[in-house]
């Protein structure tokens, strides 16, 4: 039997505890799990991709079968093919996510029939977490420590100390 290889793609700006939970759970389902750090043309970034990659690696360092890969101008299915991925992993928080993700899964299946999409329901504790909401909290100086890995809290602190625009 061939290896089961997953790809969980996102912009992770910033990575949240909800992302980490999905990745941890997905890592148990696959022999190898790639976490694809993608550029989302529809989102305004808070952190540079290189900084996001560092934060992801720090948050996931104990997961031996997980590797973070960066992809700027690529489709997830193209990166999946490069890494012999068998399954795309997507997290679902609510019905709105399902509608969006079902549409994405349809197009991915049209582009790469050999790659299956699997959905993991977000744990109840993380159901309302989103990177965009975290960015809003950061903008207004709220405490984000309950929602993100400690490395993200530290990076936000550095940005604030350096008086960089948030």
UniProtKB/Swiss-Prot annotation:
GO BP, sorted A to Z: coenzyme A biosynthetic process
Entry-linked SUPFAM superfamilies: Nucleotidylyl transferase
Keyword Hydrolase: no
Alphabetic keyword roster: ATP-binding, Coenzyme A biosynthesis, Cytoplasm, Magnesium, Nucleotide-binding, Nucleotidyltransferase, Transferase
Record pathway: Cofactor biosynthesis; coenzyme A biosynthesis; CoA from (R)-pantothenate: step 4/5
Molecular function GO terms recorded: ATP binding; pantetheine-phosphate adenylyltransferase activity
Name of the featured protein: Phosphopantetheine adenylyltransferase
Species in which this protein is naturally found: Streptococcus mutans serotype c (strain ATCC 700610 / UA159)
Gene name of the encoded protein: coaD
